């Protein structure tokens, strides 16, 4: 019986894309900083990290697909923040974004990590962007490193 499990060791030459929305920039900027810090802290050179900004979460799957199709990145980290408002727009954006990101990951075989916060209130986002619940950008970066390592091991 074989056992496979990823860890944080990744080839130094591996490139990572951090794809982040500008909407709710106060939150997403903190998520990006956390992801960059986490990658760098695990040996990924700044030159091997590309940061791409899009208008909002809705645009993340399209740009993730373009990046995945180019096969230049070992993983794509997506970061955004959707806060519930008074309309159903929140559900449409959050759900379709998550579905689109999953489709990109499955279609291209490239890890696409979903770090899009879908929260009720701005305070909930702040708690997940360096507040009491940590930094989701850091968590997504660690998951990306682990997935790259795991996929390298699999037959």
Swiss-Prot record:
Enzyme class name: transferase
Catalysed reactions, semicolon-separated: (2S)-2-hydroxy-3-oxobutyl phosphate + 5-amino-6-(D-ribitylamino)uracil = 6,7-dimethyl-8-(1-D-ribityl)lumazine + phosphate + 2 H2O + H(+)
EC identifiers of the protein: 2.5.1.78
Keyword Phosphoprotein: no
Active-site feature positions: 89
CDD domains: Lumazine_synthase-I
Listed GO biological process terms: riboflavin biosynthetic process
Assigned keywords, A-Z: Riboflavin biosynthesis, Transferase
Annotated InterPro entries: LS (IPR034964), LS/RS (IPR002180), LS/RS_sf (IPR036467)
Domain of life: Bacteria
Binding positions ((2S)-2-hydroxy-3-oxobutyl phosphate): 86-87, 128
Binding site for 5-amino-6-(D-ribitylamino)uracil: 23, 57-59, 81-83, 114
One Pfam entry name: DMRL_synthase
Annotated pathway: Cofactor biosynthesis; riboflavin biosynthesis; riboflavin from 2-hydroxy-3-oxobutyl phosphate and 5-amino-6-(D-ribitylamino)uracil: step 1/2
GO CC terms in record: cytosol; riboflavin synthase complex
Family: Belongs to the DMRL synthase family.
Matches recorded under PANTHER family: 6,7-DIMETHYL-8-RIBITYLLUMAZINE SYNTHASE (PTHR21058:SF0), 6,7-DIMETHYL-8-RIBITYLLUMAZINE SYNTHASE DMRL SYNTHASE LUMAZINE SYNTHASE (PTHR21058)
Subunit and partners: Forms an icosahedral capsid composed of 60 subunits, arranged as a dodecamer of pentamers.
Name of the molecule in the record: 6,7-dimethyl-8-ribityllumazine synthase
Organism: Stenotrophomonas maltophilia (strain R551-3)
Protein's gene: ribH
